[in-house]
Amino acid sequence: MNILITSPFTHISKNIHSHRAAQAAIYADQLSNVGHNVHLDISGDIAPDPNTFDEVYVYHGNDWAGSLNLFGGMKNYGGIDNLIRYSKIKSKVYSLWIDHPKYSEMLKSRMNGDIHDDWNKVDWNNLNLIENQSTIIREIEDTDKIVVGDSHAISMYRPGWFVNSVPFKTLHGALKEKLSSFIEPNHRIAEFYFGNIDVRHHLLRMKNPEKSTRNLVNAYYNQLLELDLDEVSVYELLPIENECRQIPKSGHYKNKPFHGSWNERNNIRLIFKNEMEKLCANSKIKFISWVDYLINDKGELSFYHMEKPRSVHLSRNSYPHWQGRKWSGLSETSATLDKFFK
């Protein structure tokens, strides 16, 4: 079956260093793995007519928050041609991860102001049909393997694994909801990757940060131990990048890109690592230590391995298991750490 993955507004970047594009590449890889012929719309390689495909999968980004922010407004927004094209789709549409947002309702209320004439080329009635008749899809491959974590968790994807990535979810918040709530009965092998946000923003706000970190790790471990699964693993957290790194406002908490100095946060990170490693030493829980290749000669998370030009995430080019280079139009390499993990 011929499949198109597209985005209604901003084009999916072909840049392998883009975190937003990484999730789209993962979806493309999963659909390819189950036997489909997949075209991923990326900047510079946009399919002219979506209706030549059997099915269309729509990617809304990996941080959809429920509202549209159009750069340039209704007068100068640069992605209108993409929406015009999208609004004319007649093929079966699947909405990736979330219910299809009601874009037509969000935009129609803005049509009375000072707008560009091209907005009148949008097929509003058909766009409304797409929104109402699309089918949500979350798990593309039928698999018993899952990675669970915050937005960093997508970096642990590889074929045969489902990733339940929950943006902005702290370890503290995940434990309150229970780790078991993030997995389904068909999942028998699970990896967990929470805690980076807690180190960046929260643990150094505690009265006794070191004690709070150990308590959090022990609570994490205890819930991992309670899971009725065949295999459970937990990932080491990311190193700390240099404080000069520019972080988008979406990564701020209380108007700050982080709380605590580099040394303080690195100390908390190492306490987190050492405590979890100690707990897992004689346990059925596997601790995955993996970050050494990301660290520069100053002991920092190297900017080379991070999303370009800014943000807190890894570049897909530096993911440990899989990089999906072909989805950015690049040749594949064997630069993974799979042998290291075995």
Outline where the language-model segments fall:
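Conserved SGNH/GDSL esterase-like catalytic core that processes O-acyl groups on lipids
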Residues: 64, 139-219
